[in-house]
Amino acid sequence: MGLRSFIHRLSAPKTSDFVPNASFKLVLVINHDLKMGKGKIAAQSGHASVSATVKMGASKPNLLDAWLTSGQKKVCLKTTLDELLELEKEAVKSGIQTVRINDAGKTQIPSGSLTVIAFGPAQDGELEQLTGHLKLL
């Protein structure tokens, strides 16, 4: 999908096959083992949010529309690298979209380090089952 098509889809009137009263969110889970600074976490979370939005627009546009029209809720949580990888496996088995962000290694942390995984956008209940036990960032 080109940039022009993507922008048009974001600004066009929305139609959705999903339940109108359903609530959707995007969950960003930070690799807390890396001890990143606040700015680094913000930048990596931004990368994850944008990447998840673009990926969802290409694969499940109706779900993206539902999330965009329901307020674009985002939640930032933290966990260890080991648990983050386990959550990713569970999400894939459940059909929840995931997006990995690996750092380029130009500032605080080694190149290739897994900094954050975005889960969703998906219905709140699905993500709550997966990540509800994690602590807020």
Model-derived features with residue positions:
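Glycine- and Gly-Pro-enriched alpha-helical subdomains that act as flexible
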Residues: 19-59
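Short amphipathic alpha-helices within nucleic acid-binding modules
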Residues: 83-89
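Short basic, glycine-rich beta-strand/loop surfaces that mediate nucleic-acid
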Residues: 2-7, 28-29, 68-79, 92-137
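Residues that cap or initiate secondary-structure elements
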Residues: 34, 81-83, 123
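N-terminal accessory/pre-domain segments preceding catalytic cores
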Residues: 1-23
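Conserved active-site and cofactor/substrate-binding residues in soluble primary-metabolism enzymes
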Residues: 40, 44, 82, 125
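Compact, glycine-rich, soluble single-domain proteins
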Residues: 46, 51-82, 93
